[in-house]
């Protein structure tokens, strides 16, 4: 069975799933799908028009965590969710914190940080407080021993390595303050960047980002 991962490699959520597939050694294809497209069939595959989504023999699956859980269930080799229910729950917990309480909060700043827009001072102030709160909570949960959940690479690392560098970058750009500065991010990113799978994902991300920038300049 071959899965098709749909979306674009500049998306951190797309790369979370791509890294999972590469780490597990699962054969898959990629289909370039941009968000914001008017393609009528897109909502049949991803009802909100979001990426990533998976095309499977049974049908499409949207939302990255649903995709990740499906992959773990269908392909048990090289498990990225522990078999122990508590340990697996702790990995899921870390993913939720890195996404819901960090990346999605920082996303409020993306219009100004990356897209030439402007974010209100009120939004910046509120976002900073939420980020500080989220980072403090995340720090209580994470291990960095040397991986996010402990000595083994897990799905939490697939999420962390695509989300946390963005949170760090955006906070420095908007506030001049890295909200993750008290975490051992430099060592962690260095460790992760030694993995061939992460190198591959990063190379594709850079190429996709350049393609996006070129497309946006063409529209102007």
What is each stretch, according to the model?
Residues 98-194:
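GST-like fold's C-terminal all-alpha helical module
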Residues 195-196, 200:
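A late-sequence structural motif
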């Amino acid at each position: 069975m071959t899965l098709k991962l749909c979306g674009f490699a500049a998306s951190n959520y797309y790369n979370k799933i791509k890294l999972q597939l590469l780490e597990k050694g699962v054969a898959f294809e990629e289909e370039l799908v941009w968000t914001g497209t008017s393609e009528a069939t897109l909502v049949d595959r991803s009802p909100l028009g979001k990426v990533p989504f998976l095309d499977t023999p049974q049908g499409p699956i949207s939302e990255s965590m649903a995709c990740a859980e499906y992959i773990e269930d269908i392909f048990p080799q090289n498990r990225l969710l522990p078999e122990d229910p508590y340990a697996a729950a702790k990995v899921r917990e870390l993913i939720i914190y890195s996404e819901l309480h960090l990346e999605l909060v920082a996303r409020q700043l993306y219009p100004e940080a990356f897209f030439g827009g402007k974010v209100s001072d009120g939004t910046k102030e509120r976002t900073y407080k939420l980020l500080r709160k989220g980072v403090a909570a995340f720090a209580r949960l994470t291990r960095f021993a040397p991986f996010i959940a402990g000595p083994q690479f897990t799905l939490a690392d697939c999420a962390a390595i695509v989300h946390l560098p963005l949170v760090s970058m955006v906070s420095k750009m908007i506030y001049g303050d890295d909200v993750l500065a008290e975490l051992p991010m430099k060592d962690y990113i260095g460790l992760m960047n030694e993995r061939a799978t992460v190198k591959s994902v990063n190379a594709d991300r850079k190429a996709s980002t350049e393609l996006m920038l070129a497309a946006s300049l063409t529209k102007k």
